[in-house]
Amino acid sequence: MKTIANESFLLDTKVPEPTLRRLPWYLSYVQLLHADGCESVSSTRIARAVGVDASLVAKDLSYVSVDGRTRVGYRVADMVAVLNDFLGFTHHHRAFLFGVGSLGAALLQDSGLRHFGLEIAAGFDVNPDIVDTNINGIPVYHKSRVAELCARERVDIGILTVPIRAAQSMADEMIAAGIKAIWNFTPWRISVPEGVVVQNTSMYAQLAVMFNRMKSLP
């Protein structure tokens, strides 16, 4: 039975999703501190930098193995190591990308994803002008080879960047080929069976939120 996918792509079901969304903010900040040679940081300083309450920072960090000390704070090097590991950025994940249009091609060009543990191993499309080419050293295949290459490469993560009308059918093909987690960049809420994880990242939805918030500006 298919269900509309929850947006959660949780690393640990015991950790609230809002916490998981904030932890990368903390990581980015302490990485800057670490690069500057800072050895310790307080929850108050982290909170001020990312714009949340200090009590919330302390609560969020209680879910991971980061111990703070009274009047000293958290060891920056420990925070960087623990948060990177907890968020999965130190692990190597391989993914296939489906839909090599403007957005898909841009993601293939983004070598920075490797720094967060994600390697895009191949792209898939139906456009004959794109199939059998390489983008940033990444091969692009016809989507008819999805099942073959998923089995051969043992890839179970898919990035979905196809046009909205093709979103559900492409997701179905991905799942049939063995994809277990889908990073969905389309504005369509795809339906998936139980046991398949979906993370929806619609830029259009975020754009609508920004436009709406701008209306309240003086």
From Swiss-Prot:
Keywords in alphabetical order: Cytoplasm, DNA-binding, NAD, Repressor, Transcription, Transcription regulation
Keyword NAD in record: yes
Bridged cysteine pairs (disulfide): none
Database matches in InterPro entries: CoA-bd, NAD(P)-bd_dom_sf, Rex_DNA-bd_C_dom, Tscrpt_rep_Rex, WH-like_DNA-bd_sf, WH_DNA-bd_sf
Gene Ontology, cellular component aspect: cytoplasm
Biological process, per Gene Ontology: negative regulation of DNA-templated transcription; response to redox state
DNA-binding region(s) from the entry: 25-64
Entry's Gene Ontology molecular function annotations: DNA binding; DNA-binding transcription factor activity
A Pfam family matched in the record: Put_DNA-bind_N
Record function comment: Modulates transcription in response to changes in cellular NADH/NAD(+) redox state.
Assembly with partners or alone: Homodimer.
The family this protein is said to belong to: Belongs to the transcriptional regulatory Rex family.
Full protein name: Redox-sensing transcriptional repressor Rex
Lineage start: Bacteria, Pseudomonadati, Bacteroidota, Bacteroidia, Bacteroidales
Gene giving rise to this polypeptide: rex
